[in-house]
Amino acid sequence: QQQESTPSSPDGEGTLGKYAVKFTGYTLAKDYQGQDTVIISFDFTNNNENATSAMVALNIDAYQDGIELESAILTDAPEGYDSESEMKNIKQGATLNCQKAFVLSNTSSPVGVEAEELFSFSSDKVVCTYAIAD
């Protein structure tokens, strides 16, 4: 049931302030209640002089049919999934592949993902769309 995919839109990477984000794929899984979930993978690069984590630097949301998806809690996570990856501090110049899981509203509509700098007045976003339907 694990599926790796590349973004269906070419603009899945960019710079947000002193951070770089590149969406690298997704995996379908089930959460602890058996609900369908999508695990979004992304590279987070810290170009700030202070060590920080993706969770502190970025806000990442996922949408289906224009409606925000809830975060998912996985107990039987697929291989390669690290629920704590976005909480790990990384130093200047380092890049870490992180994952964030969301509960799907359905398994046919595309999933749109947006990343933005958490504490910023900029409206810049890095966006990506995944066509998850089989």
What does each model-identified segment do?
Residues 25-39, 50-52, 89-91:
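Short, solvent-exposed beta-strand/turn "edge" segments of beta-rich domains on protein surfaces
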Residues 45-96, 131-133:
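The feature marks short-to-medium sequence segments in extracytoplasmic or secretory-pathway proteins
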Residues 41-45, 101:
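Short edge beta-strand/loop segments characteristic of extracellular beta-sandwich folds
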Residues 1-16, 28-31:
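N-terminal Sec-dependent export signals
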Residues 1, 86, 119-121:
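Glycine- and small hydrophobic-rich membrane-insertion segments that are intrinsically disordered
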Residues 15-24, 36-40, 56-58, 96-98, ...:
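Envelope-exposed proteins and targeting segments
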Residues 17, 22-24, 29, 55, ...:
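A structural detector for beta-sheet-dominated domains
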Residues 96-129:
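Short, surface-exposed ligand- or partner-binding patches at beta-edge/loop junctions that are enriched
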